[in-house]
Amino acid sequence: MKKIVTLMAALCLAVTAFAQSGKELYNKYSDLDGVNAVYVSPAMFRMIGKLPDVDMENSQGEKVNLTPIINTLSGFYLLDVDENSSAATQLQADVKKLLDGKKFELLFEAKENGETTRLFTAGDGKKVSSLILITRDGEDFTFMSLEGNMNRDELENILAEAAK
């Protein structure tokens, strides 16, 4: 019985170690040399969300209202590292574990002139709890994570409008 309990505890610890979030990756890498890091807190999102409309223009000059999504965000984490650094190698391995450990779905991948961009989401059919954007261009590796409780339909509509 003691062996079974020990085995179960070890399995739980192993699963927890691989189930990192954008916040945990940010905390792990943001203070390392050669890492550029940006964090936006829930308080900042609440403050921005009180503005009447937060708009951006798409390529056709049409306004896209971001307020419905901003109000649902709980964190923004960005890490940018030189792709040839040891931090980049380690970060890429941790991002791979994150994407493999949760049920992330690849929304799109774009490759152009040596640059690769991938966008992933995690959540259920109605809500998105995490949106991750990864970019590699041969010089830098960029990891961006938006976390919150985003309505999937609203997010997809905003992404479609912004992509026009």
What are these regions (language model features)?
Residues 3, 109-124:
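A mid-sequence interfacial segment
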Residues 41, 113, 136-138:
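Short strand-coil-strand connectors
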Residues 120-151:
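A short, solvent-exposed beta-edge/loop patch
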Residues 69-115:
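Mid-length scaffold segments of soluble, non-membrane domains
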Residues 20-23, 92-98, 106, 125-126, ...:
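Mature, folded catalytic cores of secreted/periplasmic enzymes
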Residues 1-25:
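Bacterial Sec-dependent N-terminal signal peptides
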Residues 22-84:
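Early exported N-terminus immediately downstream of N-terminal targeting peptides
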Residues 152-164:
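A recognition module on extended beta-rich or small alphabeta surfaces enriched in W/G with H and D/E
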